[in-house]
From Swiss-Prot:
One annotated GO biological process: lipopolysaccharide core region biosynthetic process
Single GO MF descriptor: tetraacyldisaccharide 4'-kinase activity
Family: Belongs to the LpxK family.
InterPro entries xrefs: LpxK, P-loop_NTPase
Pfam families: LpxK
PANTHER family for this protein: TETRAACYLDISACCHARIDE 4'-KINASE, TETRAACYLDISACCHARIDE 4'-KINASE, MITOCHONDRIAL-RELATED
Protein known as: Tetraacyldisaccharide 4'-kinase
E.C. no: 2.7.1.130
Keywords assigned by UniProt, alphabetized: ATP-binding, Kinase, Lipid A biosynthesis, Lipid biosynthesis, Lipid metabolism, Nucleotide-binding, Transferase
Source organism of the structure: Escherichia coli O157:H7
Substrates-to-products reaction catalysed: a lipid A disaccharide + ATP = a lipid IVA + ADP + H(+)
Keyword Nucleotide-binding on entry: yes
Length: 328
C-alpha cells in the first residue's frame, strides 16, 4: 500500500499532505539553522564523505558504500565507516564493531560492511561520537565514509554522494509520509555526486547497476552459480524486496515462492526455517545472511551483489577523494 501511495497510484497521499508539509517545514528549518551557522556542526580532523538518500526505502546505498571503501583501500587509503546502526541496539554507544558484534547490536548494514571490507566500523545515534571512536582506536584512518546520514547535519561533511533508484526515482515528489522524500529533489543541486541505481540516468548522473556474484552457502561457504540451485524460495528483508527477486529471475532463477520481509526485521531460526519445505532451497540477500549465519541450515544460500559504476565520473570522484584523504 505504501508503495502505491508514494508513487501516486493511490489518492490517499492527499490525506497525508498536512503531515508532509509539517515534515518539510521542520526538516528545512533544521538544515537552514546549520547553513546559517545558528547551530554548529562538528568537524572531524579527517575528511568525511556522506553516502545517503533523498528518499526512504532501499536505493542500493550499502553496495555503494562497500564499493567506495574497497576502491579507496585499493588506492592505499585507510578508511573508516560510521553509521546510525538502524535496527540494532547496543548496550552503550559508540560501538566499535568486532568479529563478535551481532546485527542485534549494530544493525544489518554495519555488520555487512565490516565483514565485506574489514574496515573499522562504528555505530552511534550521534555520528560524531562514532567518528571519534574510530579515530581513537585507529589514528591512521585518513577518511571517514558515513553510511546514510545525509540529513544528519550535526556532522560536517566534505563530500556528499546521493544514491537514487533509477526506476522509482522520487515517486510523487512529496515529503514523508505522503511521499518518499526526506528532502525535495532540488537538494541534488548542492551535492557532489548523484549515483543512479538502474533505470535511465539523466544528465550529470552516474549510472550504476548491481552485479550479482555466485551464490554462497551460509553453512559451508561453498559457492555456485545461483541458477544451479533448484526449488528456490527467495527471501528479502531489504528496503525494496522486488529488486532482489528481479535479480534472481535475471540470473535464470524462477522462485517457487518470494517472501518479502520488512527492512531491518529481526530473524530467528524457527521463522526462517518455516519458509522452506523438504527439498526446497532458501536464497536470501547478503543483508539477511549476516543475521542468519549463526543458525543457518545446509540448504540456505545468499546472493551477494556488487555495485558497478559506469562512465568517466567514478574515476574522477575517486581521484577527488584520494586527494582529500592524502591531504593534497
Amino acid at each position: 500500500m505504501i508503495e502505491k501511495i508514494w508513487s501516486g497510484e493511490s489518492p490517499l497521499w492527499r490525506l497525508l499532505l498536512p503531515l508532509s508539509w509539517l515534515y518539510g517545514l521542520v526538516s528545512g528549518a533544521i538544515r537552514l539553522c546549520y547553513k546559517l551557522k545558528l547551530k554548529r556542526a562538528w568537524r572531524a580532523p579527517v575528511p568525511v564523505v556522506v553516502v545517503g538518500n533523498l528518499t526512504a526505502g532501499g536505493n542500493g546505498k550499502t553496495p555503494v558504500v562497500v564499493w567506495l571503501v574497497e576502491q579507496l583501500q585499493q588506492r592505499g587509503i585507510r578508511v573508516g565507516v560510521v553509521s546510525r546502526g538502524y535496527g540494532g541496539k547496543a548496550e552503550s554507544y559508540p560501538l566499535l564493531l568486532s568479529a563478535d558484534t551481532t546485527t542485534a547490536q549494530a544493525g544489518d548494514e554495519p555488520v555487512l560492511i565490516y565483514q565485506r571490507t574489514d574496515a573499522p566500523v562504528a555505530v552511534s545515534p550521534v555520528r560524531s561520537d562514532a567518528v571519534k571512536a574510530i579515530l581513537a582506536q585507529h589514528p591512521d584512518v585518513q577518511i571517514i565514509v558515513t553510511d546514510d546520514g545525509l540529513q544528519h547535519y550535526r556532522l560536517a561533511r566534505d563530500v556528499e554522494i546521493v544514491v537514487i533508484d533509477g526506476v522509482r526515482r522520487f515517486g510523487n515528489g512529496w515529503w514523508l509520509p505522503a511521499g518518499p522524500m526526506r528532502e525535495r529533489a532540488g537538494r541534488l543541486k548542492s551535492v557532489d555526486a548523484v549515483i543512479v541505481n538502474g533505470g535511465v540516468p539523466r544528465s550529470g548522473e552516474i549510472p550504476m547497476h548491481l552485479l550479482p556474484g555466485q551464490a554462497v552457502n551460509l553453512r559451508t561457504g561453498t559457492r555456485c552459480d545461483v541458477a544451479q540451485l533448484e526449488h528456490v524460495v527467495a527471501m528479502a528483508g531489504i528496503g525494496h524486496p522486488p529488486r532482489f527477486f528481479a535479480t534472481l529471475k535475471m540470473c535464470g532463477v524462477q522462485p517457487e515462492k518470494c517472501v518479502p520481509l520488512a527492512d531491518h526485521q529481526s530473524l530467528n531460526h524457527a521463522d526462517v526455517s518455516a519458509l522452506v519445505s523438504t527439498g526446497q532451497t532458501l536464497v536470501m540477500t547478503e543483508k539477511d545472511a549476516v543475521k542468519c549465519r549463526a543458525f543457518a541450515e545446509e540448504n540456505w544460500w545468499y546472493l551477494p551483489v556488487d555495485a558497478q559504476l559506469s562512465g568517466d565520473e567514478p574515476a574522477k570522484l575517486l581521484a577527488q577523494l584520494t586527494s582529500l584523504a592524502s591531504g593534497n
